């Protein structure tokens, strides 16, 4: 990446593997660059998933039918309990929509919240991909085969935006600053 000589990571214990000159939290970068709404670089899509994985996921998702395919994420990571309750909702709130003819829902939900699928009424249709999404490249390949992603404010929403997929983002009443509450779109992603 232009301007970045090297990315230094932490080892499994959380210690840095090397010394470095500068550290900046990711969400501080727009402030450092004096970013304004009209200077946000949103030329997307800027992430392209592995074509072999995309083809594998196409076969996996085409098995079910030719309907409009929607990925769904209803909960953020439970690791941050305060944000979890502000950003997450329960899957059963979506239950009326899950059986609409012509729509196929695929759960992109990871972690404990994916178990909520087991609590839905019999006959409610949502395909749980939790065990098949081994890493973020699987998630990217699966999203590439969907028509829409509906998500709470999580990394999956950002990934879908970076892939150029349409995203319906479910925000809390007082959302994070980057979503600009006076708008109904996002300048961060052109889709």
Language-model region placement:
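Catalytic machinery of carbohydrate-active enzymes
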Residues: 1-191
